[in-house]
Amino acid sequence: PHPWTVALTYIKDCLEKETQLHFTTVLFNLYRNEKDSNGWHADNEKELGKDPFIASISLGETRKFQLKHNRLPNIKQDLNLEHGSLFLMKSGSQTHYKHQLPKSTQPKNNRINLTFRNIL
């Protein structure tokens, strides 16, 4: 782990004020182009607790983000996460749903995703 930078501390403080949630860590994901992706998963690691919440901030290229319910896996919800967007995954998100950032068929530039979490 690395210490919080001034910029990340500012973002974290704004998020906590806006959401009334507490975050102890941030994970960076870099998607370099349309070929970079992150397949279907839930952020349900033991250290995040039983029903974790995650705040996701997108920077750079707009990318499609997909959700599907565990009991209805053939029905997908597509969202376009644009530069500066905030997506909150709160109570039930990780226990009832999976999500992914799929590969794109269109050329894409860099996208950075910051996922703020609370490690217990």
PLM segments and residue spans:
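Non-heme Fe(II) oxygenase metal-center motifs and adjacent flexible, charged/small-residue loops
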Residues: 1-120
